[in-house]
Curated annotation (Swiss-Prot):
Additional record remark: This protein binds one calcium ion per molecule.
InterPro entries in the cross-refs: CALM/Myosin/TropC-like (IPR050230), EF-hand-dom_pair (IPR011992), EF_Hand_1_Ca_BS (IPR018247), EF_hand_dom (IPR002048)
N-acetylthreonine: modified positions: 1
Function: Troponin is the central regulatory protein of striated muscle contraction. Tn consists of three components: Tn-I which is the inhibitor of actomyosin ATPase, Tn-T which contains the binding site for tropomyosin and Tn-C. The binding of calcium to Tn-C abolishes the inhibitory action of Tn on actin filaments.
Segments traversing the membrane: none
Residues of the EF-hand domain: 9-44, 45-80, 82-117, 118-152
Pfam families in alphabetical order: EF-hand_7
One GO cellular component, as annotated: myosin II complex
Family under the similarity heading: Belongs to the troponin C family.
Protein name: Troponin C
Keywords: Acetylation, Calcium, Metal-binding, Muscle protein, Repeat
Lineage, top ranks: Eukaryota, Metazoa, Spiralia, Lophotrochozoa, Mollusca
Domain of life: Eukaryota
Length: 152
């Protein structure tokens, strides 16, 4: 799969948002300001996710990130949002009766169609883990967990 890249305009907007917070022109911003920078661009990121991402990017534990690291986080968030939209669209298409659930039979067919060539046993295990209440249906959150875990 090709790597996700933000558009030039998105990157310019992200750099501008960074500069708006980097008022002293130090070339870095506090990791504590990342939530506000995301928000200024209309993106909502939970505090715990920002902390995880900051810890990952701030290898020297300075509590600050430079603009390049910020752009990497910005692109990661855009990709996550895109993936979420694609998953929601796939779920919507598969939810033929528009009840907010997919029948397990449909899910079984999807899993058997994936390029990974899952065995029947693997498919049944995945369905059992997903449809924990045995209702024969899977809601969006269960579908999302399954698709993210199977890296489909």
């Amino acid at each position: 799969t090709e790597e996700f890249r933000a558009s030039e305009k998105q990157i310019l907007d992200a750099k501008q948002a960074f500069c708006n917070v980097d008022k002293k022109k130090e070339g870095t911003v506090s990791c504590k300001d990342l939530g506000a920078i995301f928000k200024s661009l209309g993106l909502l990121v939970k505090d715990d996710k920002i902390k995880d991402w900051s810890d990952e990017m701030d290898e020297e534990a300075t509590g600050r990130l430079n603009c390049d690291a910020w752009i990497q986080l910005f692109e990661r968030k855009l990709k996550e949002d895109l993936d979420e939209r694609e998953l929601k669209e796939a779920f919507r298409v598969l939810d033929k009766e528009k009840k907010g659930v997919i029948k397990v039979d449909v899910l079984r067919w999807i899993l058997s169609s994936l390029g990974d060539e899952l065995t029947e046993e693997e498919i049944e295990n995945m369905i059992a883990e997903t449809d924990t209440d045995g209702s024969g249906t899977v809601d969006y959150e269960e579908f999302k967990c399954l698709m993210m875990s199977s890296d489909a």
